[in-house]
Amino acid sequence: MDRGKETRAFTFDVRAEENEQHGTFITGTPIVFEQKTDLGWCQETISRNALNGTDLKDVRFLIGHDTTGIPLARSRNNNENSTMQLSVTENGMDIRVDLDTENNAEAKALYSAVRRGDMSGMSFMFVVDKDSWDDVESDYPKRTVEHISRVIEVSAVAFPAYPQTSIQVASEDAALDSARASLESARKQLAEARAKQAEDERRTAALERLNNLVEEVKHEQV
């Protein structure tokens, strides 16, 4: 079942490329598989199979998750005419963004910032429909994102990693609400399973005592 939208923003190898024939591009890997990520209150890993069958039909490329502005690029069904190309590999999801630096001032500024090293991070917004947890009762549980149902957008971000300013921290907290809800659900399921196990053990013990009592009565009647 799909849950709320989540975002992750970290430092990745973002590169600016220029080709006289084909224009200016930004390439990077916003989603990395099997990499342990410290989210502050838990450790998260994205499974190598997390993007199998994921909805990548309409993914936009933004700056700082600004959905009010004009997207700098877009992938529609990941066809060859899209201005953003997505490629799922054994290591994660790579992107190649074709920037219109001639007609779009934001695209030109972003390209310059990436080339200079001023902008070094990418973030992606996604929806998880399957995850699992380990060490759920500890202060630092471990989450595995088993499957992502949809990737909504990818953004270039200025503050990709911890520590962040209070504004980014607040934003990150909101983005992780879905993950926290998933953890609470896992903890509740564990508690319910333990309660059921305890009840089953109690009933089994009671039945065993009853059987022993019946056997004693039978023995006395013989």
Region spans (language model):
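Signature of dsDNA virion morphogenesis modules
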Residues: 1-184
